Structures are given as structure tokens and as C-alpha cells.
């Protein structure tokens, strides 16, 4: 279970990495009258990769003990998480492999490659991506950085 302390630890790891985005409260008017509801926006597109996924990915990679990440990291994602892991790996001087579906947008593949990741393309199924990442991790000793359902990923995202 992720605790507030886990999120604070993640925040410390992300200090100087993730942009501290402002909380915006736009004034909404409907039919000329101020709306009583509150709406808040957090412009996470200001992060270095253009998405909040940097937070969880970086926290997870930075949390790995040196012996677990010595051969590099691998993830399976079709976009923003892939870029977050690639960004974190580059910042830490690690090899990064990303398993992406063949239907991932070319812009996502190119952005991930531009961050230094090696791209492995598989079919469109999410289970197929995960299995390929697990296979490559076992063969090469890569640390798996899952795109979700991981306490370090969740704690990092919680710093938003």
C-alpha cells in the first residue's frame, strides 16, 4: 500500500527532475454567470517529456538498487511511460529497452528513440508486450519497469 511517506520520498527523488507545475483555477462562466463549481488544472505537459508519467517512471528507476539496474532497464508501453523510462535511464546513464506495439504512434516511437531507448516492436496486445519484456529481462538481466500497478510508480505519480 502506498503511503504519504512513500509519496514524500518520491518527491525528494524527483526534486530537480520533475517540473513543479502550478495548480491553475480557471474562472468558468456559463450564460454570463460565474459557475459555483470548482475546476483545477495541473499543466503536466510542462514536464520534460510532456506528460506526468515522468514522475512514476523516474521514481521507480531511481529506487532500484545499483545491482538491479546495472544491466539496464526495460519497460512495455505505447507512449508516455516509455518516454518517462527512457528519460530516467538516460539521466542515470543506463541502457533502456522499450517494448512497443506495432500500432504505437510513430511520434511516440521516435520521441522514445530520441531519448536513447532501443525499441522492440511486437503485436498490439498489452500481454504480448509484457511477455516480451519479461523474456528480454530474463535473457539480459534488465530490470523491469512496469507501466502501472507498482508502488514506486504509483508513489511517483502521486507527487503530482
Roles of regions detected by a PLM:
Residues 1-160:
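PLP-dependent amino-acid enzyme catalytic core
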Amino acid at each position: 500500500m502506498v503511503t504519504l511517506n512513500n509519496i514524500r520520498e518520491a518527491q525528494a527523488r524527483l526534486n530537480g527532475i520533475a517540473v513543479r507545475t502550478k495548480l491553475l483555477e480557471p474562472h468558468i462562466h456559463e450564460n454570463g454567470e460565474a459557475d459555483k463549481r470548482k475546476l483545477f488544472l495541473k499543466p503536466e505537459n510542462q514536464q520534460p517529456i510532456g506528460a506526468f508519467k515522468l514522475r512514476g517512471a523516474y521514481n521507480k528507476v531511481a529506487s532500484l538498487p545499483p545491482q538491479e539496474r546495472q544491466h539496464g532497464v526495460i519497460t512495455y508501453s505505447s507512449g508516455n511511460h516509455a518516454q518517462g523510462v527512457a528519460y530516467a535511464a538516460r539521466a542515470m546513464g543506463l541502457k533502456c529497452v522499450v517494448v512497443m506495439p506495432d500500432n504505437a504512434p510513430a511520434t511516440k516511437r521516435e520521441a522514445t528513440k530520441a531519448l536513447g531507448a532501443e525499441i522492440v516492436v511486437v503485436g498490439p496486445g498489452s500481454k504480448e508486450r509484457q511477455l516480451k519484456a519479461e523474456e528480454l529481462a530474463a535473457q539480459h538481466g534488465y530490470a523491469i519497469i512496469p507501466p502501472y500497478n507498482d508502488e514506486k510508480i504509483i508513489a511517483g505519480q502521486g507527487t503530482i
